[in-house]
Amino acid sequence: MSDKKAVILLSGGLDSATVVAMARAEGYACYSMSFDYGQRHRAELQAAERVARQLGVVEHKVVGLNLNGIGGSALTDSSIAVPETPGEGIPVTYVPARNTVFLSLALGWAEVLGARDIFIGVNAVDYSGYPDCRPEFVEAFERMANLATKAGVEGQGFAIRAPLQQMSKGEIIQAGMRLGVDYALTVSCYQADDDGRACGKCDSCRLRAAGFAAAGVPDATRYF
């Protein structure tokens, strides 16, 4: 096993699966972290486990959080409908501070493991407009990580890696195919059923379908 370790945020979706494959291709021993945070699309947790097995991660950790106790998002509050048509501004599927919370916990695990690199599959090209997916956020979090940790102040700095940041969804899928990602294992839908079948209507489904079309690859998604 490689001495070079990385912690990777793995939702079970298309983007994060590709990031695991990219990190593995760079020679990292991969440690993946998923979150059971009260999301309505819980099928993504089973997808994350499947992806972790397929791509040979060293350890896959699922952390429980109660973000539905805070609410404020269609993904954590069942009284808020998931939009089926694009809207203006930041959509109601934005989960307040989600990537800040997730990266903070990944940072803690990375410090324990002695990993210096943390990978996240955020994208600022084909995305829903979430503020915590932008390059400015990633750069700011990296600065904070190196101010707020024992490892950081002792000169063992962390890097927050976002390799998909400037890639289109089609480019991401093409890269993942070259690296052996089985996209049939992944779940992207915001309201997937218990079997992981997708609605085909939400923003995440639309972006995913457009990505497969742009990549010229058969869509591996199962729909209900």
Swiss-Prot record:
Alphabetized InterPro entries for the sequence: QueC, Rossmann-like_a/b/a_fold
Cofactor list: Zn(2+)
Name of a matching Pfam family: QueC
Role played: Catalyzes the ATP-dependent conversion of 7-carboxy-7-deazaguanine (CDG) to 7-cyano-7-deazaguanine (preQ(0)).
Name of this protein: 7-cyano-7-deazaguanine synthase
Gene Ontology biological process: queuosine biosynthetic process
Catalytic activity: 7-carboxy-7-deazaguanine + NH4(+) + ATP = 7-cyano-7-deazaguanine + ADP + phosphate + H2O + H(+)
EC number: 6.3.4.20
Top EC class for this record: ligase
GO molecular function, one term: ATP binding
Cofactor note text: Binds 1 zinc ion per subunit.
Keywords: ATP-binding, Ligase, Metal-binding, Nucleotide-binding, Queuosine biosynthesis, Zinc
Binding sites annotated in the UniProt record for ATP: L10, S11, G12, G13, L14, D15, S16, A17, T18, V19, V20
NCBIfam families in alphabetical order: 7-cyano-7-deazaguanine synthase QueC
Pathway it works in: Purine metabolism; 7-cyano-7-deazaguanine biosynthesis
Superkingdom of this protein's organism: Bacteria
Binding site for Zn(2+): C189, C199, C202, C205
HAMAP family: QueC
SUPFAM superfamilies assigned to the protein according to its UniProt record, in alphabetical order: Adenine nucleotide alpha hydrolases-like
Family under the similarity heading: Belongs to the QueC family.
